[in-house]
């Protein structure tokens, strides 16, 4: 290691004698740069990057549809893990290119970066794609790619491998009714891991989102791959109501603050923009999200179009509050308004500018103001058309703002007035006992589970805190994020014992802190995040034995009017075997989707009653190294998690081998 920092005479001579000349300049031709540095073009070589290839080909097909040249797109996932995407548009040009007279335009597009029809407004007024490098990048990173173009009764086809041409352009006779472009490709395992394959669910959801974004297209879906999910083998995907249909499928309509969805679909020729949006507000943030798109391309990091929408909504609600004389509206922030909102925004513009090759953020100038003006006009009309609706919405977001302000100002909260001052979503349902001895706080996720738990509890000794907001991974977050996270703030205020060096055992308001999450994988994930919080922010609380995990059942088994419960698949199998040995009567098996699905009586009997439940006490054998252990498992470095999993797998494998009777 020290040799790295030594500077001896020999090395000095090498530096002096070393000739840095033209021959040292490496020139990568054609698609070589893509294969050598794929991360520069698709953001990496992981599963997300590999799925960018599908997005690019699908974006090209959608461009044909949005331009009015295609109405049908087919997506087929094959047994061999390749994928075919077809659109019935004009078909990629096959005549020779003026700049490259010995090559067809098709070959130029597939083998040359920054080529295509998207650079000319005469061809596409709006277009997506990876800055014009997309289809050539797909070709470069594919083990095999076959393209077929149907034009004027002819079929033109050509094959490629790793960006290199395998065959010349072949022309055959075809039906004159056929037209369009078909691309079949398989990602190159030399670039991506051999274990990586396309995820049918991810691609199906991508196809649905594209169909929502453009009402004039029908996507024909076919999946030959065996999947263990609710993804259909075949489907016709079409949504005549666009984003309104999309939002309706994502939310619970009976949980809305105000009835209906604020939606619009406007084309402004003066601003050269086509805009569609759909927004609703729910009573909690369980389905809160903001999704935006530009020219059907998702922009997960937002951008100027999102800025315009947010300004419109904020200005609109503040103006309405001022109009009706509600001075509290002046304190609103956009975070208050979007806290429980579900938002989808889509725009079509000419020559969009994105940040980065993978287009995750729109940075086009001149977009924010037109979007703001259009949505503001419609939002003002939406609010003024129904006074009761507008007032309910305003009061809802003001209550969120007041909660935010109160959390900032409050430092000491007693049990007596905790519920009133905290204004926790779903309310902190506190116990009536004033001393902490014998009391329990159940931490649950969301109002649904919280509602069942509140009815099932013993009101004297058991309190229920539904966490409102996303549970943060404390191990990989900055101090600023931790301090500002809503769920963590709610929890620290309810416990009242302080954290880190400020932890005071005597101020802890409950004897037992019980994490009660769903019995499935998602519930285990939330529980692990909460344990991470306690290990890193309140290690003394864990060391003193206050932290527990509840064990709710995952399955309900009914036989001959008797009900039994099982916590997991293994326990269910053993229980069924036992029941069938005792009786041949039919067993009905039900799976709980979550705590909120359980009746209060069931939740009390299985999970909350002190004499009938099972609790797991959370502890660590090595408290001195807790920071390192948690950082290895929950921190920013995935290689440490991989090492842990690998070591545990070896232990498990050794055990299995030792038990084999060979």
Curated annotation (Swiss-Prot):
Protein residues bound to ATP: 20, 60, 87, 129-135, 359
Domain Toprim: 439-553
Gene3D superfamilies to which the protein is assigned, alphabetical: 3.30.230.10, 3.40.50.670, Histidine kinase-like ATPase, C-terminal domain (3.30.565.10)
InterPro entries per UniProt: DNA_gyrase_B_C, HATPase_C_sf, Ribosomal_Su5_D2-typ_SF, Ribsml_uS5_D2-typ_fold_subgr, Topo_IIA, Topo_IIA-like_dom_sf, Topo_IIA_B, Topo_IIA_B_C
Keywords: ATP-binding, DNA-binding, Isomerase, Magnesium, Metal-binding, Nucleotide-binding, Topoisomerase
One GO BP: DNA topological change
Annotated Gene Ontology cellular component terms: chromosome
Site location (Interaction with DNA): 470, 473, 525, 641
Protein name, as recorded: DNA topoisomerase 4 subunit B
Organism: Rickettsia conorii (strain ATCC VR-613 / Malish 7)
Gene name of the encoded protein: parE
């Amino acid at each position: 290691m020290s040799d790295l920092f030594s500077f001896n005479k020999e090395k000095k001579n090498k530096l002096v004698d070393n000739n840095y000349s033209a021959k040292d300049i490496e020139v990568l031709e054609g698609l070589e740069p893509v294969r050598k540095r794929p991360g520069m073009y698709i953001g990496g070589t992981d599963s997300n990057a590999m799925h960018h290839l599908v997005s690019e080909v699908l974006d090209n097909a959608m461009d044909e549809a949005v331009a009015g040249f295609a109405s049908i797109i087919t997506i087929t996932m094959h047994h061999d893990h390749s994928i075919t995407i077809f659109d019935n548009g004009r078909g990629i040009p096959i005549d020779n290119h003026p700049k490259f007279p010995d090559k067809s335009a098709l070959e130029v597009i597939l083998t040359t970066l920054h080529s295509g029809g998207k650079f000319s407004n005469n061809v596409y007024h709006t277009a997506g794609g990876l800055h014009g490098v997309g289809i050539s990048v797909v070709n470069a990173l594919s083990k095999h790619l076959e393209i077929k173009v149907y034009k004027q009764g002819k079929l033109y086809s050509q094959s490629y491998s790793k960006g290199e041409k395998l065959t010349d352009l072949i022309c055959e006779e075809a039906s004159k009714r056929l037209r369009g472009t078909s691309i079949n490709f398989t990602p190159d395992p030399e670039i991506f891991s051999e274990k990586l394959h396309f995820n049918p669910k991810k691609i199906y959801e991508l196809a649905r989102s594209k169909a929502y974004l453009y009402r004039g297209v029908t996507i024909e879906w076919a999946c030959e791959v065996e999947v263990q999910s609710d993804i259909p083998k075949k489907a016709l995907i079409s949504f005549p109501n666009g984003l309104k249909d999309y939002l309706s499928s994502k939310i619970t309509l009976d949980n809305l603050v105000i009835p209906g969805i604020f939606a619009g679909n406007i084309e402004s020729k003066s601003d050269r923009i086509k805009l569609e949006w759909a927004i609703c507000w729910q009573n909690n943030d369980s389905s809160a999200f903001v999704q935006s798109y530009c020219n059907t391309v998702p922009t997960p990091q937002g951008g100027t179009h999102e800025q315009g929408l947010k300004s419109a909504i904020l200005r609109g609600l503040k103006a309405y509050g001022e109009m009706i004389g509600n001075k509290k509206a002046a304190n609103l922030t956009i975070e208050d308004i979007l806290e429980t909102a579900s938002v989808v925004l889509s725009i079509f513009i000419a020559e969009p500018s994105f940040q980065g090759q993978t287009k995750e953020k729109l940075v086009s100038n001149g977009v924010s103001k037109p979007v703001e003006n259009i949505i503001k006009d419609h939002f003002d009309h939406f609010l003024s058309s129904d006074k009761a609706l507008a007032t309910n919405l305003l009061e809802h977001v003001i209550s969120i703002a007041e909660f935010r302000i109160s959390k900032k100002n409050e430092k000491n909260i007693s049990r007596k007035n905790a519920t009133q001052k905290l204004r926790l979503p779903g309310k902190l349902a506190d116990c009536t006992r004033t001393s902490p001895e014998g009391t329990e706080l159940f931490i649950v996720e969301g109002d649904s589970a919280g509602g069942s738990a509140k009815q099932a509890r013993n009101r004297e000794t058991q309190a229920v805190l539904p966490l409102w907001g996303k549970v943060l991974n404390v191990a990989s977050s900055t101090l600023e994020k931790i301090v500002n996270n809503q769920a963590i703030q709610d929890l620290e205020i309810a416990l009242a014992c302080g954290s880190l060096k400020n932890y005071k055992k005597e101020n802890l308001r409950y004897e037992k802190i019980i994490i009660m999450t769903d019995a499935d994988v998602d519930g285990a994930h939330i529980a692990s995040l909460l344990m991470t919080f306690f290990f890193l922010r309140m290690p003394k609380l864990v060391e003193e034995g206050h932290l527990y995990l509840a064990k709710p059942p995952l399955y309900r088994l009914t036989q001959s009017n008797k009900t039994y419960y099982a916590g997991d698949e293994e326990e269910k199998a053993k229980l069924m075997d036992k029941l069938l040995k005792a009786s041949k009567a039919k067993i009905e098996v039900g799976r709980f989707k979550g705590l909120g699905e359980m009746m209060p009586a069931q939740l009390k009997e299985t999970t909350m009653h002190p004499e009938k439940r099972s609790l797991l006490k959370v502890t660590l054998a090595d408290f001195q190294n807790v920071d390192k252990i948690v950082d290895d498992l929950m921190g920013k470095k995935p290689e440490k998690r991989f090492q842990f999993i690998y070591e545990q797998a070896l232990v498990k494998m050794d055990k299995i081998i030792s038990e084999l009777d060979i």
